[in-house]
Amino acid sequence: MKFTIMDTRIFRRGVRSGTVVRLLMLGAVIYFAGNVRAQETANAPTDAETVKALLQRVQDLESEVKTLKSQVQALNPTPANDISSTPVAASSGTVPVSTAMAEHEVMAVRADADPNMPRLQLRGFGDVNWKASDLHGQTNSFALGQLNLFLTSRINDKLSFLAETVIEADQGSNEFGIEPERLLMLYSVSDRLNLQIGRYHTGIGFYNTAYHHSAVMQTAMGRPFLFQFEDNGGILPIHNVGVSATGLISNRLGLHYIAEIGNGRSARTSISNPVQNVTDENNGKAFNLGFYVRPEAISGLRFGFSGYHDHVSPLGGANISENIFAGHVVYQTSRFEFLNEAVVLQHTPDNSNVTVNIPGFYSQISKRFGNYRPYFRYEYVNVPGRDPLYSDVALVHGPRAGLRYELDESAAFKIEFGRDMRRNQGAVNLIGTQFSFAF
């Protein structure tokens, strides 16, 4: 369309200038409206074709999902000794890996679509060590530590699952063993009541519930001797199978409680596993009740105490009443820690009025300077010779001093020196290094 602007003198003689302006604007509107209408007409078939193609793609995907699910349901599980990526006939009784992967992807899509569907999370922890001492007859050795597979699953807002499975080699036989150190259903009613049902770490003191089976989380190379695991010579019931309840009593005071009941542990002199996972050796149950305070006024401070009671049945001997009283005062921040714990075990045979007291304590201090954290710990345990359960431990005490270097947030290198002094034995000097990591 072409517009010709006439000489302005003509407008002055016959046509008003306002009329011409209005004509020009009307022509422009007609021109652009025609172009827009043409574009809409051209795009309409394209949009319709796009929508149709998308709908067809959705139908195809739904059909594929239904086909894959029907195939998986129709086939048997894959035998453990026949893992192949090549699809085989259904009559062979194996599921092709490609089909299993497709089913896994379908489940993943469902999990993404449904936020309430349980989700399994896996973390791993491990450590490698080198240790040496001047004890006669002992060799220096590199040693694999614990491989810790830590599983959690949130089922809903209140219910979750936790499993901590450790793969570890025996020091004597060098053979690997697998043990679920913690296996728990967790039910959170509120801040005032949280339940753990299954195999848990007993709430005796601070260290046992603050540090579990991960070396990278601990400042030093190992746990204090007082809190060593049962199968490593420890004298405390570190694990228990039963029910544990924890919760907040007073938010203003920062007061919390711990209440536990379980099978307890068997006598260490028994040939059975110290942790009574399936069968209790007697009808009595172990009880533990504790309280601790975390005052808001002093961030990082915690102090508390607990009392534990059980009956232990050693082979060929009378039942033994066991009481354990523990107290702790801890100050811990990201850069500084000062851990102090004391425990007294009391053993009283049922056929005697004599009570044997076993005192023990440790104190650990460390401070972080950049990526470096030097630390020092002194520990002490004294088991009298007349104790019916742990007389072989006797008196052991001594210092540990070391340096931890943070490679990053998930890995650390440690070097440590120690000196163990035992009753009726000479002192033993120790040196060790450790590389610990999380993945």
Task: Explain the meaning of each model-derived region.
Residues 260-278, 310-314:
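Active-site-proximal beta-alpha loop/turn segments in soluble metabolic enzymes
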Residues 135-136, 184-188, 196-199, 214-217, ...:
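Outer-membrane beta-barrel pore domains
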Residues 21-31:
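Bacterial N-terminal signal peptides
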Residues 36-130, 439:
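N-terminal periplasmic/intermembrane-space "pro-region" immediately following the signal or transit peptide
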Residues 276-284, 320-322:
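Interfacial loop-to-helix transition and helix-capping segments at the boundaries
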Residues 31-32, 185:
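Hydrophobic alpha-helical segments of integral membrane proteins
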Residues 107-267, 283-288, 292-299, 364-375, ...:
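Outer membrane beta-barrel
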Residues 1-19:
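N-terminal secretory signal peptides that target proteins for export/translocation
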